[in-house]
Structure formats: structure tokens, C-alpha cells
């Protein structure tokens, strides 16, 4: 029971999965036949366990042959004592144990869509027996700005991020003809 009591008393809340604020914004500008539409979303507050990064920072002997994250090059050595990356020790099974070291902010700003279009003047489209013609280019999931490069905090509903695929970036072009 002493162990259970010590363990229970040693645990502390280190953050919250739930964000403080979520939101989005969009805007459309039109001038001289051109139109530009932008939409974005954001989240402030909340934490996520970056297990993808944790897995790439492994040092255990059973992990031979696995890739490492580039940050492993900053590991502690007698010549590199000013670092936040522990020394490499294949015999230390706790080197990448779950801890607050892997807890990162789930704040993000996502540029969801940008669309740029041009509507041809009526005097040009009338000759083709059209009511209107619009050319456009659109990009979805254009950019994500987050606390750690490579993590997509939009993917986690369980406070754990472990190598999930992020939203696909797409670029499309189109023509809208109205008869």
C-alpha cells in the first residue's frame, strides 16, 4: 500500500486535452473581376502527447535499425552538456518513457482554403453565348502552423498523437461557365 500511496501522491495534472478557445475566420475580397477567398481555423490552449516524436527519440537496444529524429544529434555528451536531450544509453529502458517531455501545446493555425478567381467581362463572354465565365484556382489545407513541426494537433481526440496522417493538401483549377 505504501507504493500505491506514493504513486497516487506523485501524480500531478500537467495540462488539459481540451482547448481554451477554438475558432475560425474567413474573408472574401472582390475587385476588377478578381475574387480572393481565404478561410482558416485555430485552436488555443490544450496539450497533446507527441508519441510520434517520442518513438523517434528511442535509444533502447531492441530498437536497433529504427530511424531516429534529427534532434537525437543534440543528445547529452561530455562535450555537449547544455541540451534538453538525454544521453544515449541503450540499456536505459526509461529514456523515452512517457513523461511531460513529450507533452506539447496543441495550439495551431490552419490555412484551410485559398481560392483566387477571375470572372471574364460580360462583353467577352457574350460572343460565346455565355451568361458568365469564371476561371479559378483553389488550394485546400495549404498550411498548418503548430508548436512542433510534424505534429498535426487537429488529429488527436485522445490527447495522443502517434504518426497519424494529416489532412491532404490539394490544389485544383476550374472553369465555371453559366449559360
What name fits each language-model region?
Residues 21, 32-34, 107, 129-133, ...:
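Outer-envelope beta-barrel architecture signal
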Residues 24-26, 113-117, 172-174:
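Membrane-embedded beta-strand positions in outer-membrane beta-barrel channels/transporters
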Residues 30, 41-43, 138-142, 178:
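Outer-membrane beta-barrel pore domains and translocons
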Residues 33-38, 123-124:
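Repeated loop/turn-to-beta-strand initiation elements of outer-membrane beta-barrel proteins
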Residues 43-134:
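Extracytoplasmic gating/loop element in the C-terminal half of outer-membrane beta-barrel translocons
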Amino acid at each position: 500500500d505504501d507504493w500505491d500511496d506514493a504513486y497516487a501522491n506523485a501524480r500531478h495534472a500537467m495540462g488539459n486535452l481540451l482547448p481554451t478557445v477554438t475558432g475560425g475566420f474567413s474573408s472574401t475580397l472582390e475587385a476588377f473581376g478578381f475574387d480572393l477567398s481565404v478561410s482558416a481555423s485555430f485552436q488555443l490552449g490544450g496539450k497533446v502527447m507527441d508519441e510520434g516524436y517520442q518513438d523517434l527519440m528511442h535509444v533502447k537496444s531492441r530498437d536497433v535499425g529504427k530511424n531516429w529524429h534529427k534532434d537525437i544529434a543534440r543528445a547529452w555528451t561530455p562535450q555537449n552538456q547544455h541540451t534538453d536531450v538525454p544521453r544515449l544509453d541503450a540499456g536505459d529502458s526509461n529514456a523515452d518513457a512517457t513523461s511531460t517531455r513529450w507533452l506539447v501545446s496543441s495550439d495551431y493555425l490552419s490555412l484551410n482554403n485559398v481560392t483566387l478567381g477571375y470572372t471574364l467581362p460580360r462583353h467577352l463572354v457574350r460572343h460565346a453565348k455565355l451568361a458568365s465565365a469564371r476561371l479559378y484556382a483553389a488550394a485546400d489545407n495549404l498550411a498548418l502552423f503548430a508548436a512542433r513541426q510534424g505534429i498535426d494537433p487537429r488529429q488527436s481526440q485522445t490527447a495522443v498523437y502517434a504518426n497519424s496522417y494529416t489532412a491532404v493538401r490539394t490544389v485544383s483549377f476550374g472553369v465555371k461557365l453559366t449559360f
